[in-house]
Amino acid sequence: MKTFVLHIFIFALVAFASASRDSAKKIGSQYDNFETCLTEHGLTEDDIFSIGEVSSGQHKTNHEDTELHKNGCVMQCMLEKDGLMSGADYDEEKMREDYIKETGAQPGDQRIEALNACMQETKDMEDKCDKSLVLVACVLAAEAILADSSEAA
């Protein structure tokens, strides 16, 4: 059974990190619960931001707040269906485990540090949808930066 390690994406999450290489793909589109969560929120794939747009931060300037919120609700739905969130609360340990499993990251890996920093940055946010999108965006941005720095090395 395929685990939705969006887990980042972190983030959501988790799998989003490896998906960040394909910037034209929609965030979360490669996971089992994507279509279900779209349907539950009355959205289509066209309503969902691309990985490239989110990892670069363009989603914040190119879209209305309602679009941001709706995308976040789809992310939260997928995270919750995969047991990584309950409401607005993360299961941080499960998120780390799934992220490590998805990415192959080892202890001390900067990707794990980035995931931890993103969870810390968003942990006090109360709106579950906004929190989920900010988390996913944080992880994708960190993945993009780390990928760029390793390519430059």
Swiss-Prot record:
Determine if Nucleotide-binding is one of this entry's keywords: no
Main subcellular localisation: secreted
Q: Which residues, by range, are in coiled-coil regions?
A: none
Q: Which residues form the signal peptide?
A: 1-19
Biological process, per Gene Ontology: response to pheromone; social behavior
- Give a yes or no for keyword Transport in this entry: yes
Keywords, ordered alphabetically: Behavior, Disulfide bond, Pheromone response, Pheromone-binding, Secreted, Signal, Transport
One function term, GO molecular function aspect: pheromone binding
Q: Where in the cell is it found?
A: Secreted
Cysteines paired by S-S bonds: 37-77, 73-129, 118-138
UniProt xrefs under CDD domains: PBP_GOBP
Annotated Gene Ontology cellular components are: extracellular space
How does this polypeptide assemble, per the annotation?
A: Homodimer.
Q: What does this protein do, in the record's words?
A: Colony queen number, a major feature of social organization, is associated with worker genotype for Gp-9. Colonies are headed by either a single reproductive queen (monogyne form) or multiple queens (polygyne form). Differences in worker Gp-9 genotypes between social forms may cause differences in workers' abilities to recognize queens and regulate their numbers.
Q: Which family does it belong to?
A: Belongs to the PBP/GOBP family.
Protein name per the record: Pheromone-binding protein Gp-9
This protein's gene is called Gp-9
